[in-house]
């Protein structure tokens, strides 16, 4: 029976031949923007590793039997779970980067400095970095937040939305216009699937299939191939 470490080691060995090797996609968008929906549809079948501490946090909340309505009475327990979820996600990202595996880094986009630092680090390793920004109006974000299984207070949604919006121009300068895809997700999921997501999926696959240009990446791959022949 394979252990967790055995499986991770196998992933590292197979990373050299992964379709999305040395490709990293950052997702940005506030609560209620529909990032999870976009990820499931636009990246389906690509094999990229999704890095999302919120997803790990939500799974742990459910497992612990806590409420997804985030009551104040459960704040201390939630904080402990959130810390563990972030640590687990960090380990997953570190392991994936060791194998230079393709990444989907799912966040809100509130913290420009954090994303900028992550992107610079990945570029230094040879990664091609792009961003998918899922955009909605504040009214739509507030309404969708009410309908979500895990909700946050309205003022939190508003604050997050404003912070993310203020970073759009910065992200365009950081990633470059050709590597930043902005999705208008004010319409229903059905309308988004039939029109926008088909286009996004094509762009994502085009970026994944673009030949690697980084000398650092090519040197790493050559070194790995040489090591495998020994």
Please tell me what each predicted stretch does:
Residues 123-144:
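Conserved phosphate-donor/acceptor-positioning beta-strand/loop module used by diverse small-molecule
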Residues 106-115:
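Acidic, metal-coordinating catalytic cores used for nucleic-acid/nucleotide bond scission
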Residues 24-26:
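Short hydrophobic/aromatic beta-strand immediately N-terminal to the Walker A/P-loop
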Residues 37-101, 113:
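Conserved substrate/cofactor phosphate-moiety recognition/catalytic segment
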Residues 15-22, 95-97:
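Phosphate-binding P-loop
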Residues 30-31:
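The conserved Walker
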Residues 138-230:
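Conserved GTP-binding G-domain of TRAFAC-class P-loop NTPases and closely related GTPase folds
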């Amino acid at each position: 029976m394979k252990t967790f470490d055995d499986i991770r080691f196998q992933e590292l060995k197979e990373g050299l031949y992964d379709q999305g090797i040395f490709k990293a996609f950052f997702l940005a968008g506030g609560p209620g923007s529909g990032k999870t929906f976009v990820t499931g549809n636009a990246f389906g079948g690509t094999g990229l590793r999704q890095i999302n501490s919120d997803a790990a946090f939500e799974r742990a909340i459910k497992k612990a039997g806590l409420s997804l309505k985030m009551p104040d009475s459960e704040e201390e327990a939630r904080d402990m779970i959130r810390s563990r979820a972030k640590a687990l996600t960090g380990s997953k990202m570190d392991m994936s980067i060791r194998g230079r595996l393709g990444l989907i880094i799912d966040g809100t986009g509130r913290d420009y400095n954090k994303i900028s630092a992550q992107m610079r680090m990945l570029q230094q390793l040879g990664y091609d970095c792009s961003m998918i920004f899922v955009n909605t109006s504040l009214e739509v974000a507030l309404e969708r937040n009410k309908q979500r299984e895990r909700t946050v207070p309205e003022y939190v949604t508003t604050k997050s939305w404003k912070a993310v919006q203020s970073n759009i121009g910065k992200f365009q300068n950081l990633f470059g216009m050709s590597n930043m895809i902005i999705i208008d997700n004010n319409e229903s999921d059905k309308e988004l699937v039939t029109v926008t997501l088909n286009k996004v999926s094509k762009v994502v696959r085009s970026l994944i299939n673009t030949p690697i240009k980084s000398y650092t990446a090519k040197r790493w791959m050559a070194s790995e191939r040489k090591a495998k022949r020994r």
